[in-house]
Amino acid sequence: PAYMALSHAKALAQRAADGKPDHFHYVQMPLNLAMTEGLTSSTQEVGGKMYPAVRAATLLGLRVMASGAIRQAKLGTLPSHVNKALGEDLTSDAQRALQFTRSAPGVGTALVGLKQPTHVSEALALCTQAPMAPSAVLGMFGKPKT
């Protein structure tokens, strides 16, 4: 498969812990407006059912750190319906992209690298906005694909 089986990794961590609590608590995966598979593609088996990676991680007790939150600044221009869904009061596509990733249900941290002080200020301004409701994020895509 083209993905890591999270349940297998968790089972290996539990086996290595030899009956004690394992130390596998976090997983990092790409998640952004261009790479939504972590929310939309059911690639992970947990308990005999298929789930998207972020949901599977949550079911396995893992915290998700989403990398590439603003897609290394290669956003392009977001379509108007995406802008509307993410919040028309946000001032840039970078803020909208970060809003999407930080609001994704099951994501604990959205990782982003910023070089310019103005970009840092722009990202920090997002802290004055509430994250999107989980249903609003998931509603952007419809039902997860299997």
Q: Where is each model-derived feature located?
A:
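Beta/alpha (TIM)-barrel catalytic core signal, keyed to glycine-rich beta->alpha loops juxtaposed to Asp/Glu
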Residues: 1-146
